[in-house]
Amino acid sequence: MKRIFIFTFLLLLAVRVVSAATVDTLAVHSPSMDRDVPVVAIVPADYGQDTARRWPVVYLLHGYSGDETAWLKIKPSLPAIADRERIAFICPGVGNSWYLDSKVREKSLYETFMIRELLPAVEARYPVVRDRSGRAITG
């Protein structure tokens, strides 16, 4: 019994060490909305080691009443997936905006933020693919 416990403990420790993706919490400034938007970025552990490599990137959009942490709560294994699949995940927190530019609320320009502000901010900070060949959005 003691051997099984020790083996299980060592196995769990090894699994934890293998999954070492970086999970960053960022505040991306939006000039169009005049505020900072919270964003969680999950990137493979070695994303900065090969400067010539560009990682595919998936933008994960949360649902109504969610936030930038929603996808980590839904799928806690995202860091391990980022490492295994060599992919970056970006999770913006946009409140209950529906990701659109509002015609009623002047400073609710989330479509503008996503396309003109978030993508360039992510591409400046992380070595991700900068065109549709390596970019996806889902939610």
List where the protein language model places each region.
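Sec-dependent N-terminal signal peptides
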Residues: 4-15
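Non-catalytic cap/lid and distal C-terminal segments of serine-dependent acyl enzymes
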Residues: 20-139
